[in-house]
Amino acid sequence: MDLMELLKQAQRLTNETNTDTEVPGVERTMSQVLQATKEFHSRVTQMGTNDLQAHILLGSKGVDLPKLTQKLESLSARQTFEPIDPVTETNVQAYLKNERENAILSVIDETNRSIFKSVERQKWRCIYSEWGEEKEALLNALVGPNQQDFPDVQFQIVPTAMADEPTPYSQLNGHEQMYAEQIAIHNQSIILGRRPNLLSTLAHVVQDSFNDESVAEMWNVLQFMTALPPVSSTIDPIKNRQTSPQFVEQARTYLERRYRTYMRKFIVANLAKARRGGIPSVYHMVRSYVGVTLQGQRALYGLHDVNNGQPLWPHVYYSLRSGDMDAAALYLKESGTCPDLLTLLTLRKNGDRDNLMVKLEGQLKLEYNSRLRACTDPYKKAVYVVLLACDPHFTHVELMRSIDDFLWMQLSILRRSDQSDSNTEQLTFSGLQSLILEKYGENYFNAREKAALYFQVLTLTGQFEAAIEFLARTEKNRTHAIHMAIALNEISMLGTPRSVEQSLLSSDPDDPKPMKRLNLVRLIVMYTKCFERTDTTQALHYYYLLRNFKSENGRGNVMLTCVCDLLVEKCDDEMLELIFGTEDKKNGLRYGGIYAEFQIHECDKYSLAEMVGDELSKRGDYELAIELYFIGGQLDKALRLVNSLLAQVVHQPTQNGSVRNRLGDIINRLDAALVVRKSDVEVQVVVTYTVLTKVMKFFDHYHEGALRSALEILTNNHLIPASSLEVDECVTNIKRMGPEVIKVLPDILLASMDIVYQEYVKLMDSNETASGFFDESKCVNKEPAVKHLRDRAKAFTNMAASVPYRMPSTTNQRLVQLEILMH
């Protein structure tokens, strides 16, 4: 191919590649074409280099490459011994656990749904029932006594909301009213100089009037535990309770008496088996009881020693459990066994504690530790433990049939600190209290459902405060708990904190653990707040019980603080008449009132009224505070508040029901009182009050349009100057007055300037001489009168600039503006 043919082919190819689009052609140089060729060549050689080398290598060795490729594709990388499909391991225990939990959850969920549906149905049933009763009551109220008035209405008589004999509204229920009546009677006795036992009184009322055995039992145990010789109010109840063995003896005696009652009832229920006989006594009762309870060989298995054909130690134990040491000693004497134990029992019964008794206790403890710890007779072990006060951690499971048995056993092995033996482990009163309150607690005794039981356990262990606080948590028992606390405090057996601001139940660092102190003030105040507005008389009787507690805010005792707070919250005429008595219109004094019946020497009703007035004054309720100051005879404080109120509203026009209008009645009462008791008030206060009342009259005349009378009042009292010559005199007079007068001075100057300006306008619009309230000798014609008015206006502006008080900018602007308008 020559060069011409090659050129023709190139042109033909060029023509074929040309398109109709107007895309510009790309021209490359030879160097660019060479570079692009190298790039394409490098890409092709890199992609195929590895495969080509592999083919060359294997082909030279005689390997059939296509077959090799097929074999490689058929190979699998997985191990032949593993299954192709993954199989998870079977965990039977986890599967069963999961199924069991799912079943439990499904049951719980189903139960919840059924309970919710049941509650929902019950709720709507009750709602529909209440709606039906309301509709019947409304229809019954609409339908009159004559059926002829509504012939088409069918009705039946149902109980209406109103009683046949309406009674006064009260927040107290029947039980609370009974308690409140007894509190009022008790307070009256205290006022008359008598001091009855409130706890015994309330216990008898509950027994006779309340149809609740659990509440009566709680009062009975509290009454029994406090049936001790009275103690002085100066002795701390907590320390006395912890150091005196009488409380432990009382608790044990209570449990022993209750057990004797149980034994009698048990024997009466089994008279055929009991075979009672002989003289009625604990000795024969125990014999009958043991004869019924321990029948058959199985019941007698493991018991030691026999007396008259019956086991000995059950008789001794139940005699001690019944509180009769004589019967226990008689059984031991009849059997002739354990003479040392009989001697110890006799010494313990007689109250002797000498060297012989200490020696016997040591010998018997050695015998117990060496031989009786492994004894199979639980009654014998219990007798030794009770008489020797040892082995406090042994549970005596065979004999503990109730919490009473457990408590009696623990109380029987208690030893005071002065009787403790360092060589043996013994139980103390504080240890038993901690065991009941802290170790076992409410959950162990199921206190939510068995509140009476838990209360009795705490009371029998001397923890009155914790027991009452527990009862006070529930609405059902709160009323009983509060009155139990009141009754204990009245006989000086309730431990109260040092500060009335403490929580309801608190601990004192000086008290032995776990003893608590109950804040009686907080308990009573929370209780009375519910009804103090509707049953004020009853609330005051409860507050009277707090007269011996000191208030933290420095307002005397807590009773005064509570009554003061009550009056501050509700200080209407009815409340004032109830507490302070009826007002005598002649002299303004109040006579009667329930507060006077309490005869509080530290603070009479006048001091109480002053205290309430001070509190109302702090809260900004000045009108009520003034009324209380009137009752308390505090004219000075009443005048100060009246001055403060007058300074705020004296410039306002009079309107019915406004503060300014009500101040008029107060001013009339103050004027009448100042005639008699003006010497009791500071002179400065009286002067300020007098000036403000004059200013009040000035503004009354000003708003009524009596301009002449208004200016005469100010001129006569030298409050504003009549001319420029009197400015200094008026400023000096203002300085001697109280801040209340200075506060109202801008309004006085504005009103006075307005009066002068109105007179100026009237004078300029008239051809007559000046108004009649200017001196006719000075105002013979219009010009002197105008000059006099301008001079007076100038005096007002000068006075506003001279007083030692920063006038409002609007006042100065208005004064200058009116003065300029008069030129």
Swiss-Prot record:
<keyword id="KW-0653">Protein transport</keyword>
<dbReference type="GO" id="GO:0097240">
    <property type="term" value="P:chromosome attachment to the nuclear envelope"/>
</dbReference>
<dbReference type="GO" id="GO:0006999">
    <property type="term" value="P:nuclear pore organization"/>
</dbReference>
<keyword id="KW-0509">mRNA transport</keyword>
<dbReference type="GO" id="GO:0045814">
    <property type="term" value="P:negative regulation of gene expression, epigenetic"/>
</dbReference>
<dbReference type="GO" id="GO:0003682">
    <property type="term" value="F:chromatin binding"/>
</dbReference>
<keyword id="KW-0811">Translocation</keyword>
<keyword id="KW-0813">Transport</keyword>
<dbReference type="GO" id="GO:0034399">
    <property type="term" value="C:nuclear periphery"/>
</dbReference>
<dbReference type="GO" id="GO:0017056">
    <property type="term" value="F:structural constituent of nuclear pore"/>
</dbReference>
<dbReference type="InterPro" id="IPR007231">
    <property type="entry name" value="Nucleoporin_int_Nup93/Nic96"/>
</dbReference>
<dbReference type="GO" id="GO:0030717">
    <property type="term" value="P:oocyte karyosome formation"/>
</dbReference>
<dbReference type="GO" id="GO:0005643">
    <property type="term" value="C:nuclear pore"/>
</dbReference>
<dbReference type="GO" id="GO:0016973">
    <property type="term" value="P:poly(A)+ mRNA export from nucleus"/>
</dbReference>
<dbReference type="GO" id="GO:0031965">
    <property type="term" value="C:nuclear membrane"/>
</dbReference>
<dbReference type="GO" id="GO:0031490">
    <property type="term" value="F:chromatin DNA binding"/>
</dbReference>
<keyword id="KW-0906">Nuclear pore complex</keyword>
<dbReference type="GO" id="GO:0006606">
    <property type="term" value="P:protein import into nucleus"/>
</dbReference>
<dbReference type="GO" id="GO:0044615">
    <property type="term" value="C:nuclear pore nuclear basket"/>
</dbReference>
<dbReference type="GO" id="GO:0097298">
    <property type="term" value="P:regulation of nucleus size"/>
</dbReference>
<dbReference type="Pfam" id="PF04097">
    <property type="entry name" value="Nic96"/>
</dbReference>
<keyword id="KW-0156">Chromatin regulator</keyword>
<dbReference type="GO" id="GO:0005654">
    <property type="term" value="C:nucleoplasm"/>
</dbReference>
<comment type="function">
    <text>Required for nuclear pore complex assembly, maintenance and function. Required for nuclear import of phosphorylated Mad via importin msk. Has no role in classical nuclear localization signal (cNLS)-dependent nuclear import via importin-beta. Mediates the association between the nuclear pore complex and a subclass of silenced regions bound by Polycomb group (PcG) proteins, enables long-range interactions between Polycomb loci and contributes to repression of polycomb targets.</text>
</comment>
<protein>
    <recommendedName>
        <fullName>Nuclear pore complex protein Nup93-1</fullName>
    </recommendedName>
</protein>
<keyword id="KW-0539">Nucleus</keyword>
<comment type="similarity">
    <text>Belongs to the nucleoporin interacting component (NIC) family.</text>
</comment>
<keyword id="KW-0472">Membrane</keyword>
<comment type="subunit">
    <text>Part of the nuclear pore complex (NPC). Interacts with msk (via C-terminus); this association might be facilitated by Nup75. Interacts with Mad (preferentially when phosphorylated). Interacts with Nup154 (via N-terminus). Interacts with the Polycomb group (PcG) proteins Pc and E(z).</text>
</comment>
<dbReference type="GO" id="GO:0036228">
    <property type="term" value="P:protein localization to nuclear inner membrane"/>
</dbReference>
